[in-house]
């Protein structure tokens, strides 16, 4: 019952998949988190407590208006019932007692054991397939809207897109000339190379593999390699990620599966430069 009540109030904000567990819609994208669903449950319990206290207040005021003495409410349940004079007082007392029972129930549920069990019981009601998340590889989510990379058209962010990531930047021409000057510095004004890198970055913004590319930024130190790629990674926000360079080598002997699992849904992954 409590799990259904929770989902009735928060169905639009919570989903669950087996690999990710709970995700919460934060207004911009679906955020994977163990703590946010707990916060949702705590907010739900706070609302229930406020509702119970309001019912107690309303039913108490009704009893007083019907002439019931406050001392009568301090009696044992049977004596309290016997003290009521007429059907109206009895009905008001039943409402008052039900409201107190409701509040006592809510107070008993305000602990982590109950919160976790309620969230677990709610799973079947908000269960989704992992394939539903980020299902359109051509959509990219930004702070001011979601853009279709095929058309360049933007629209308001929507929870129905099931997007789990967001960029740090919005489409804008602000600072464009500074960036163009930086590119000419990084790539020695080589237009063909700049055009190629632009294509690579464009491919990286798309959420599916159109071309299998491992880019190796080679060159002496302090020539802009890290500055360029770190800038792109910053723009892409949580669409980008990092990986240890040794995990890409054949001779890596440690377990890299957890590290690789963290890359799910990333569109650009950067490894620090190797020693050789």
Regions found by a protein language model. Give the residues of each.
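P-loop NTPase catalytic core of nucleic-acid-dependent motor ATPases
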Residues: 14-35, 132-135, 146-267
